[in-house]
Amino acid sequence: MALSLHTVFLCKEEALNLYARSPCNERFHRSGQPPTNIIMMKIRSNNGYFNSFRLFTSYKTSSFSDSSHCKDKSQICSIDTSFEEIQRFDLKRGMTLILEKQWRQFIQLAIVLVCTFVIVPRVDAVDALKTCACLLKECRIELAKCIANPSCAANVACLQTCNNRPDETECQIKCGDLFENSVVDQFNECAVSRKKCVPRKSDVGEFPVPDRNAVVQNFNMKDFSGKWYITSGLNPTFDAFDCQLHEFHMENDKLVGNLTWRIKTLDGGFFTRSAVQTFVQDPDLPGALYNHDNEFLHYQDDWYILSSQIENKPDDYIFVYYRGRNDAWDGYGGSVIYTRSPTLPESIIPNLQKAAKSVGRDFNNFITTDNSCGPEPPLVERLEKTAEEGEKLLIKEAVEIEEEVEKEVEKVRDTEMTLFQRLLEGFKELQQDEENFVRELSKEEKEILNELQMEATEVEKLFGRALPIRKLR
């Protein structure tokens, strides 16, 4: 079987390859089958994709006894042509493949950048490489999804602003509050809980377990049923949200709480978060309620009731001190005041102050929350407020820059004054040297000097080495 190749170059680095195959094999003559010429046409472009067609030419009337049919320039009497498409190039599919490849490369680069600029500064230098290696090996998919998700990517960018701040942990938690979604949760579950790529923050003893005597000895969990507001909180990271309305009910021997609260946005708006927590009572210490066995970060919260007053009155309250732990942080904590009223009753403050002292806290440091739960401001108002705050921020930064410039000018002025003073002092020293020089001249030398009426420099030139070397000072 003869096979020849002919290439035709087209525009834009495209080429057309023609493969011509002639039926010169003797088997075709003996078989009596209709001979067929096959031409393969392959179009190749510079993007590496091909479009191939096969052209069949069948001879209906021809004599195969003549070997001239096997020549390159055969005369064809009657040709029946048909096309068979082998592979069709889909432009959309090709572009999709290219974009997918570029997107994968972008994601890989973004992962490396996240490791370099976000994760590494957040952990100790010893653990930095281990953390990045673990994420790239164990949580590559979750990290790629995070970078591709706007909220999760914004969370990563927000975390970058927390590096090396005094309130670094609190800043990181606020970032999570603002940008939390399912993608963020999946990344945290892999990096923190499942693969433990991120080191756990140790307990520093800020919120220790309270003394048993500081906890109420008798408490009925059924008294917690109904709606309660958190009207005051100790920890600004966990306790001081607006519109904290929690509704509790009993399920068998467990207390179930449906918790809702608001997260403020940067433009003055808000969005509402919610969670469900289940508590069991400590049989040996009724004032202790435990919320364990949670899937998300395996967090565990222990509540200790320091004081309570439940008489179905507007000033009913429950003073809760809590501490907790999860896969990311061991030993976080805080304290909240639950009241039936959306505002803190003044009449219960003395009781709260006494209870706060029992755990070494000052109730004056608690933060009053806003439970008015009003509607979200209109978008125009929020934009105006944001613009005003931005203007205030610019003015503040301009004032700070001006103050820094003034300080630099003062430093330069002080430097110039110091230099001038040193020059003046040096000039005085030269005058003193000159006076000492003249004073120590001998009588004969002074007479000669007076006669010559020379200056000190001229005297030095005149006498040269003849003048006695003396220590003038």
UniProtKB/Swiss-Prot annotation:
UniProtKB keywords: Chloroplast, Coiled coil, Membrane, Oxidoreductase, Plastid, Thylakoid, Transit peptide
Record-listed E.C. numbers: 1.23.5.1
InterPro entries in alphabetical order: Calycin, Lipocalin_CS, VDE, VDE_dom
Coiled-coil region: 383-463
pH dependence: Optimum pH is 5.0.
Gene3D superfamilies reported in the protein's UniProt record: 2.40.128.20
GO molecular function: violaxanthin de-epoxidase activity
Extra facts: Associates specifically at acidic pH with monogalactosyldiacylglyceride (MGDG), the major lipid of thylakoids.
Function statement: Part of the xanthophyll (or violaxanthin) cycle for controlling the concentration of zeaxanthin in chloroplasts. Catalyzes the two-step mono de-epoxidation reaction. Stereospecific for all-trans xanthophylls. Zeaxanthin induces the dissipation of excitation energy in the chlorophyll of the light-harvesting protein complex of photosystem II.
Family of this protein: Belongs to the calycin superfamily. Lipocalin family.
Name of the protein described by the UniProt record: Violaxanthin de-epoxidase, chloroplastic
Record organism: Lactuca sativa
